């Protein structure tokens, strides 16, 4: 934008200084017009580019040269004859790729020979080479469809400019690096052929190069490892694994490589809580090729996974991150709309009906269109869903027809073995439903979803059912394998014992909601209300007709767990008071004082206190340096004392405490 130079930004000032200092007569780089022909004989075509002033001026900026080519200044071509670069159909048959030695031998110094004929025009080929030269000049008002409109760009840049203006303008050695901009191509064979030519040229000249531009076309024959910087994390997309040992090898290598790079898959919050990085540990399932995808070959497998995840909320919440709920990155099906389960049941019946009609020849697009408008979030986004089918079989583009299912309700665990056992669980569930599809009725959880299943006890009970069902199907899992996941997801805050009664506190889950739009500089923003937190309270050994547990003087609606003498409930409270919150007039409820009250004697037998911040008023402004400091910060916020002294009248025993109709397992201090 020429009217918004953003001179306040140091990086923008450095960019403008760099652009204006080089001048208009400075040669940025070199362009070789190049295009794959797509037929036998000469594999490549080239030719001159025609400009009115016989000079090629790039679009202003400092991006790579290939992104700034003045393609609109080339001779006119009719829309019907424009040479679009189209992606190949992923279901098209493909032959084996040539060996690397064959490609290198093709471009050896003794094998390269291209003859240029100045009279060659149109689609004529030069003899003895692999490149056809097209030199015909376009006539007036004629469509110049033969002109090559893609090219290989080569330029020299100083890589130090990527480290900021201080390094760029500092006293460092200004050394240029040769950057080769790869053009867009449709076939992987052409990309590898061009890459072999670039490699042979660089090797003969003895120069080091950096590839940039367009990546290779998506192809099942190519293993692709992508590393992308994201805010706060580095996203790594690993190439597919074909068997279980390869899955273990990939996961262990990823964690080890991150450790050697001084990166970690965990972090500690300011208050010392151990959490994930916030980045996803998304699992992508599919086949070696799109045609081999188990979800397209057997659509009831996908239906079984969706229905099973719905009936077992522990699979949605045990491995997710802190941000859960209808506006999170991976909401459940029943968190989108109230009638979504009703529509899901209709969609699953349609899959079953079409399967009976078409049998093994069921069109794959039916699976996509049946579930595309079901697996969405509250805004209709198909990507922000627990089960993302954007790359299953979307007819919109070839990159959407890959037969892949992405499970997004997984956060990066802190240890590689925690990630490995997650993937082992998924493999077992896929194998189970491949043999015997899941056909149980869908459960209407209602408000139980954000009530019961926010607590450690009920998530563990539901997950134990999952492991039991897998064991009955021949897939035996030791529950101890998932003990680190429960301790990581529901960390223990503290425990106190009074007269044979035990009171245990654990962090529980809390769905955060997105607030309404608010005005901000340059537009509008929508804040996330993270001011609410939840604590699970588990008590054992009490007499429910005599004892009661209170939080800041309010009786807790303890519920039986099915185990004699153990009662559980959760406390929802406002931990801090941000400028934008759901109820801004409600103050902070911390510290929380828990009392085990003897209603017969009308006094507190004992209890504990939990502080959200340091009880001495210390305000930490840095993150913990290691796990030991984080643990000390957590322990400093829990006290096995501080219960309410004196007489406590009017407290009802556990059996007489009224519970909320919407959230019977939760005491909301608001």
Where are these regions (language model features)?
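C-terminal accessory/tail domains of diverse enzymes
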Residues: 1-209, 215-232, 239-277, 288-670
């Amino acid at each position: 934008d020429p009217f918004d130079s953003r001179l306040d930004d140091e990086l923008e000032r450095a960019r403008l200084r760099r652009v204006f200092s080089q001048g208009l007569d400075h040669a940025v780089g070199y362009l070789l017009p190049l295009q794959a022909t797509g037929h036998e004989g000469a594999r490549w075509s080239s030719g001159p580019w025609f400009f009115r002033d016989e000079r090629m001026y790039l679009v202003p900026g400092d991006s790579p040269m290939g992104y700034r080519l003045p393609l609109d200044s080339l001779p006119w071509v009719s829309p019907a004859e424009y040479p679009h670069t189209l992606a190949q159909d992923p279901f098209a048959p493909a032959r084996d790729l040539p060996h690397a030695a064959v490609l290198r031998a093709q471009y050896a110094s003794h094998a390269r020979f291209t003859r240029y004929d100045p009279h060659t025009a149109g689609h004529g080929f030069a003899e003895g080479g692999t490149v056809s030269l097209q030199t015909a000049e376009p006539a007036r008002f004629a469509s110049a469809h033969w002109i090559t409109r893609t090219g290989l760009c080569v330029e020299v840049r100083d890589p130090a400019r990527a480290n900021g203006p201080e390094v760029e303008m500092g006293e460092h050695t200004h050394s240029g690096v040769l950057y080769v901009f790869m053009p867009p191509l449709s076939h992987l064979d052409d990309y590898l052929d061009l890459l072999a030519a670039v490699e042979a040229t660089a090797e003969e000249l003895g120069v080091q190069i950096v590839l940039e531009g367009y990546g290779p076309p998506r192809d099942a024959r190519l293993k692709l490892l992508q590393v992308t910087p994201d805010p706060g994390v580095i996203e790594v997309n690993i190439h597919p694994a074909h068997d279980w040992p390869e899955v273990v090898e990939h996961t262990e290598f990823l964690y080890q490589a991150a450790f050697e790079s001084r990166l970690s898959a965990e972090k500690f919050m300011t208050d010392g809580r151990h959490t994930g990085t916030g980045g996803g540990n998304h699992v992508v399932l599919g086949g070696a090729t799109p045609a081999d995808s188990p979800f397209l070959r057997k659509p009831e497998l996908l239906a079984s996974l969706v229905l099973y995840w719905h009936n077992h909320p522990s699979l949605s919440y045990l491995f997710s991150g802190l941000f859960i709920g209808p506006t999170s990155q991976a909401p459940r099906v029943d968190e989108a709309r109230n009638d979504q389960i009703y529509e899901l049941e209709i969609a699953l019946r349609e899959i079953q009906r079409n399967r009976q009609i078409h049998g093994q020849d069921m069109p794959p697009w039916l699976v996509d269109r049946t579930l595309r408008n079901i697996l969405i979030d509250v805004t209709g986004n198909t990507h922000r869903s627990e089960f993302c089918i954007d790359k299953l079989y979307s007819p919109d583009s070839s990159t959407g027809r890959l037969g892949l299912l992405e499970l997004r309700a997984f956060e990066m665990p802190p240890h590689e073995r925690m990630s490995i056992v997650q993937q082992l669980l998924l493999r077992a569930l896929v194998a189970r439903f491949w043999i015997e599809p899941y056909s149980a009725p869908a459960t209407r959880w209602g408000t139980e979803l954000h009530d019961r299943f926010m607590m450690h006890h009920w998530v563990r009970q539901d997950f134990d059912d999952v492991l039991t069902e897998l064991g009955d199907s021949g897939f035996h899992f030791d529950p101890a394998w998932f003990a680190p996941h429960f301790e990581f997801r529901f960390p223990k805050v503290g425990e106190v014992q009074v007269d044979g009664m035990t009171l245990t506190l654990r962090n529980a889950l809390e769905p955060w909601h997105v607030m309404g739009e608010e005005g901000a500089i340059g537009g509008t923003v929508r804040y996330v209300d993270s001011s609410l937190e939840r604590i699970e309270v588990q008590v054992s050994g009490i007499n429910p007709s005599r004892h009661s547990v209170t939080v800041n003087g309010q009786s807790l609606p303890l519920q039986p767990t099915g185990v004699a003498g153990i009662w559980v409930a959760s406390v929802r409270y406002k931990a801090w008071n941000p400028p934008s919150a759901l109820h801004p007039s409600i103050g902070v409820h911390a510290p929380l004082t828990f009392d085990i009250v003897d209603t017969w004697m009308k006094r507190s037998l004992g209890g504990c206190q939990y502080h959200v911040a340091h009880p001495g008023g210390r305000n930490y402004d840095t993150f913990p340096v290691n796990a030991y400091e984080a643990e000390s910060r957590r322990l400093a916020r829990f006290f096995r004392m501080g219960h309410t002294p004196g007489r406590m009248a009017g407290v009802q025993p556990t059996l007489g405490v009224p519970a909320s109709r919407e959230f019977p397992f939760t005491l909301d201090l608001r």
